[in-house]
A protein has these predicted regions:
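Short alpha-helix plus adjacent loop in nuclease-associated cores
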Residues: 80-94, 150-179, 235-237, 403-420, ...
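Noncatalytic, basic helical substrate-engagement surface that gates or grips nucleic-acid strands
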Residues: 2-139, 143-171, 244-247, 253-261, ...
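Conserved "right-hand" nucleotidyltransferase catalytic core of DNA-directed polymerases
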Residues: 241-408, 435, 468, 476, ...
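Conserved RNase H-like, two-metal-ion catalytic cores of nucleic-acid enzymes
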Residues: 3-5, 11-12, 22-61, 79-80, ...
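Accessory alpha-helical DNA-binding modules that contact the DNA backbone or grooves
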Residues: 182-249, 290, 574-601, 810-813, ...
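C-terminal polymerase-core module
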Residues: 581, 585-588, 592-646, 814-862, ...
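Short hydrophobic beta-strand that contains or immediately precedes a catalytic carboxylate
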Residues: 13-14, 138-140, 374-376, 455-456, ...
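Conserved catalytic core of nucleic-acid polymerases
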Residues: 502-508, 562, 670-673, 677-678, ...
């Protein structure tokens, strides 16, 4: 509970960058990217916080303060001030001009002062305004502002992870930090330091110790005058770091007397410029904000909207009546008002019809059967296809009109109704449209119902059009239709549920009228999106990729998920014990290098061990929180500095293997099938590769003995074997095709070992004289260069001097000159078009390809080189899967496709089919694409995945 006593005259001072950074990182795992590929996370988060403040407080006086950039007076005293901070992310740099324009459109003043930070400007403004009788609210999450809190000066702190603000006055600051006065925050920071600003503080003194010292001595000055009262190591730390403590206090002190001219009129908010706001929010695609501020166009409505239940049997003449009654519309009338940009079901004309009787079902089937295409969706009790029960079906054949078939709780009656729709759903002459159709196909499959005909999945269509963005229906409806869909939680009456959502299994408790609208809207909106995407696919020359590769793959993936794979859980349990013993051995080996117990799983303790006690490097890098970096990338670079690092890396690898796979896989076994059923994701990886989840089988390590052992647990069914078919060096073969390099084409055409042949050319020796080490280096170069590897990167990977790595790369390009030309052309094409594409027309967009930031641009250039290769490989294996599936159906094989992992397909094959099926798979995969070099597939057979691979 707040104990503040604010005055009626409030002034709000906002620390812009503190809020901008917070907003940007809040969306880091799921950034907001608009249709132009612009990351709007920082802008959207900042404006939402500003909006909430204005709605809650309606401030008359408000100012937003920016850091000016460049060095300040603190840098003149301490060069290392904020030196550890990473460069401002490119997306934040790009966001600042937009944010400033939006602030101006809100009628709010912007302040910044050369040589001073926003803290100092706000500190000075706060003290002056306090003296003039105002209540000052400093809006920032940063703790250093606590030192400014005083009578009528408050910290107005945005809550993390939820809406609202916490107002901190004197008593709240004292209670939060254990201080007698907010001003002591300066002394607290002086002792404990502040990693975010690289303020060193007193080494070895953390927040707890610093708080106790301030509690005991009152201030740093008093502490330094009474060091004789300290004892032991603490005394040594304080005495030896006296000057650093004083320096840290100086750096932590926010100035309150900088020379800034200020009048209250300058921070008085002016009227908003709604024209500018509309322009900016439209450009940024902030539809929620457009809706919130009612910034839509003024139009004349010719008639009121109808959102009542219509008749199933309405014809164009609107003459028929039925058991399902149609409510009449109001008389048309002219009204002029502002239409919010984001429409909803409440202000959009629609006709959503409930189907309950047998006659209605027959009539609906007749209507759907008379069309060449329809959209459908299932409403179910679970997102798990093995658990889901269908509670309803929705259909649409034209925009703004849809039908909902409500299914009873009775399982037998539900199955009877579904069987009536089966011929329609399985009809190959009728095109089916849906959103995430793999799910609907799987659920209907549980009832013995297939889905036939050409398919159009709006989720996959949007993925091809804009692979980097989100593909859920809610998002797409907002972007392409300016429409806000009904959210599941809104189907329930209580406010708490509306905000937090309800488990999907509670769908049977939803009032039927609401469920009808919700389900019909899904089918209706999906159909409207289909009409938009179909044209866009054509305009982008993506129709063939969509209809010939992506859509035929959908039912195949559904079938693979249903097939699942057997797991030997006893073997995994035994292997878990083996790994635990190995981990204990590594722990003993690590402890042999240290004289004190250590938690090997603690990055903090590992950092202190490596960089403070063992001092393996002079200037170790740190994270934003001031902790030593001990991530895998950092430790890999240091692995030869001390034997303990290799042990730490090995310990981490085994522990991850144990927790992520060995112990986790048995928990994912479906009790109904005794198999694991991974989910294959078609719209996640922008290059077109499939990913898998629950479990993720793409990341099972295969290069080391420990990781390979996990594959042993994937076993064949009784009377069967596992068959693994793996493309050999497919990405290099694609590089040879795309680049047309004669030397590379020749090596593949003659069937040479490509890595040995590469080594012979790089090192300018006969093929017979290539050593194993030379081949290893050439292999690393082969695969590294198609990912745009640098000399530094190659030297790190091969653990060789950079000069030698550079010589290898130079030798590579000298040997394969067309490869270098291809790489340059790919980058140039990306710069010119903003995208690159695969052999089959898949587009991969690169918004950062012309970035002014060299590292950001370099990353985009590497993607420009590799994405067409990786994407083409993804397209090829998808075509192969379609061809193999056709062979299985054509020959009535009992063999089942179970897994797809990168360039490998895994099948469960009855022993009686092995020889014939092996040839069918090999032929289908090797003829999936026609390249200038042959595609080669290695096929293996075994009782488990490891044996087969």
């Amino acid at each position: 509970m707040n104990t503040v006593q604010p005055t009626d005259d409030k002034v709000f001072l906002l620390d812009a960058y503190a809020i901008i950074y917070r907003s940007y990182y809040a969306f880091l795992k799921n950034p907001r990217i608009n249709s132009k590929g612009v990351n709007t996370s920082a802008i959207f988060g900042f404006v939402n916080i500003l909006d909430e403040l204005i709605r809650n407080e309606k401030p008359e006086y408000i100012a937003i303060v920016f850091d000016p950039g460049g060095k300040t007076f603190r840098h003149e005293t301490y060069e290392e001030y904020k030196a550890q901070r990473q460069k401002t992310p490119e997306d934040i740099k790009n966001a600042i001009p937009y944010i400033k324009r939006i602030i101006e459109a809100y009628g709010i003043g912007i302040f910044e002062m050369e040589g001073y930070e926003a803290d100092d400007v706000i500190g000075t403004m706060a003290k002056r305004l306090q003296g003039e009788g105002f209540g000052v609210y400093m809006m920032t999450p940063d703790k250093d502002y606590a030192q400014l809190v005083d009578t009528n000066i408050f910290q107005y702190k945005p809550r993390y992870g939820s809406a609202g603000f916490d107002v901190l006055g004197v008593e709240e600051i004292k209670a939060k930090y254990g201080l007698d006065s907010p001003a002591q925050m300066i002394d607290l920071l002086g002792l404990m330091g502040d990693a975010s600003d690289n303020i060193p503080g007193c080494p070895g003194v953390g927040e707890k110790t610093a708080t106790k010292l301030i509690k005991d001595f009152g201030s740093i000055d008093n502490l330094l005058h009474n060091t004789d009262k300290l004892t032991g190591a603490l005394k040594t730390k304080v005495v030896q770091n006296r000057e650093q403590i004083v320096l840290s206090r100086f750096l932590a002190t926010i100035k309150t007397d900088i020379p800034i001219d200020l009048s209250i009129e300058e921070i008085k908010r002016k009227p908003s410029d709604t024209v500018k706001m509309r322009e900016l929010f439209t450009e940024l695609e902030f539809r929620t904000l457009l809706h919130r501020h009612q910034l839509g166009d003024i139009i004349v409505k010719q008639e009121t909207t109808s959102h009542t239940q219509g008749s199933l049997f309405d014809t164009q003449a609107k003459e028929q009546t039925s058991a399902i009654q149609k409510a009449t519309n109001e008389s048309p009338k002219d009204t002029t008002d502002i239409i919010p940009t984001l429409k909803t079901i409440n202000d959009t004309r629609h006709e959503y019809i409930l189907i309950q009787t047998d006659d209605d079902i027959d009539r609906l089937i007749e209507i759907l059967g008379s069309h060449s295409a329809f959209c459908f969706d299932t409403e179910t009790t679970s997102l798990d296809t093995f658990e889901a029960q269908i509670v309803g079906l929705s259909f649409a054949v034209e925009p703004q009109k849809a039908y909902y078939v409500a299914l009873p709780d009775d399982k037998q009656k539900t199955e009877e109704i579904l069987r009536r729709f089966a011929p329609l759903l399985e009809d190959a002459s009728i095109e089916k449209t849906g959103q995430n159709m793999k799910y609907d196909i799987s659920v209907l499959g549980n009832y013995g119902i297939g889905v036939g005909g050409r398919m159009f999945d709006t989720m996959i269509a949007h993925y091809l059009l804009q692979p980097e963005l989100r593909h859920n229906m809610d998002y797409m409806a907002e972007v392409f239709l300016g429409y806000r869909t009904i959210h599941f939680g809104e189907l329930f009456d209580d406010d708490k549920t509306k905000k937090s959502g309800k488990p999907i299994e509670d769908i049977r408790k939803v009032e039927l009228g609401k469920l009808k609208d919700y389900a019909c809207e899904d089918a209706d909106i999906t159909l409207q999106l289909k009409n938009i995407f179909q044209q866009k696919l054509c305009e982008s020359s993506l129709e063939n990729l969509f209809f010939d590769i992506e859509m035929p793959l959908v039912p195949i993936l559904a079938k693979m998920e249903s097939n699942g794979v057997l797991i030997d859980d006893f073997a995994l349990a035994s292997y878990a014990e083996t790994l635990k013993r190995e981990l204990q051995k590594i722990e003993r080996d690590i402890l042999a290098y240290v004289d004190l117990p250590i938690n090997i799983s603690s990055p903090k303790q590992i950092g202190e061990l490596l960089f403070e006690r063992l001092r393996i490097v002079e200037k170790p890098s740190k994270t934003k929180t001031g902790q030593y970096r001990t991530d895998e990338e950092t430790l890999q670079k240091l692995r030869n500095r001390h034997p303990i690092i290799k042990l730490i890396l090995e310990h981490r690898g085994l522990k991850k293997l144990l927790s992520t796979y060995v112990e986790a896989l048995p928990k994912l076994i479906n009790p109904k099938t005794n198999k694991i059923h991974t989910s294959f994701n078609q719209t996640v990886v922008s290059t077109g590769r499939l990913s898998s989840s629950n479990p993720n089988l793409q990341n099972i390590p295969v290069r080391d003995e420990y990781g390979r052992e996990i594959r042993k647990a994937f076993i064949a069914e009784p009377g069967c074997v596992l068959l693994s078919a793996d493309y050999s060096q497919v990405e290099l073969r694609i590089m040879a095709h795309l680049s047309g390099d004669r030397n590379m084409l020749s090596a593949f055409a003659s069937g040479q070992d490509i890595h040995a042949a590469t080594a012979a050319r790089i090192f300018k020796i006969p093929l017979a004289e290539v050593t194993a080490d030379m081949r290893r280096k050439a292999k690393t170069a082969n695969f590294g260069i198609i990912y745009g590897i640098s000399a530094f990167g190659l030297s790190e990977r091969l653990d060789i001097p950079r000069k030698e790595a550079a010589a290898i790369i130079d030798g590579y390009f000298e040997s394969f000159p067309e490869v270098k030309r291809y790489m340059e052309q790919s980058i140039e094409e990306a710069r010119r078009n903003g995208f690159v594409q695969t052999l089959f027309g898949r587009k991969l967009y690169l918004p950062d390809i012309n970035s002014q930031n060299a590292s950001v641009r370099g990353f985009a250039e590497r993607i420009a080189i590799n994405a067409p290769i990786q994407g083409t490989a993804a397209d090829i294996i998808k075509i192969a899967m379609i061809k193999v599936d056709e062979a299985i159906r054509r020959h009535n094989y009992r063999s089942q496709m179970m897994l797809q992992v990168h360039d490998e397909l895994v099948f469960n094959v009855p022993t009686s089919e092995v020889d014939e099926f092996r040839q069918s798979v090999k032929h289908a995969m090797e003829t999936a694409a026609s390249l200038r070099v042959p595609l080669i597939v290695d096929v293996g057979i075994g009782h488990n995945w490891l044996e087969a691979h």
